[in-house]
Amino acid sequence: MKIKTTILLVLATSALFATSCREKLAEAKSDPLLRAYDSEQDWNNPDRIIPLNYQQAQGKRVFYQYCVWCHADATPAGPSNRSNLNPMPPLANDGAVFNSLSDDFLRNTITLGGSAVGKSGLMPPWGKTLSQEDIDAVIVFYRAIAQPPYQAPAQPGPKYSVR
């Protein structure tokens, strides 16, 4: 009789434990930050954290190595050079500027430099420094942090590319 009681007690405890694990697993699946590869603090709202997938996280890495010096107000080393440039480059999270530009246009701007696409000649061509995968990752990162949030076009526009 003691063995049956012990077995029933162990089974009941195991069932309760399994149920609580399932609840925590369901909770983890619903929280995008727990599934994120990395995150970025919203530049406009410090209380908001933006979850990043792997490609967006790679873009963040490239951004903070090459782009932050002109496309952010602050860098890991202190203030950026942005305010010293004329025309002043847009912030990377400026959805009002970047949301209206196609991925191909951004790709060409990064690859060929600003003057190649009718923008500021102060934007250097990164095509020989960065791989196409890195450039695509930076674009995806910009889209992830854009304020207002980026909405992909329902139908892609005309395509021209350096590829």
Language model segments and positions:
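Periplasmic/extracellular electron-transfer cofactor-ligation site
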Residues: Y54, K60-M88, L112-G121, A144-A152
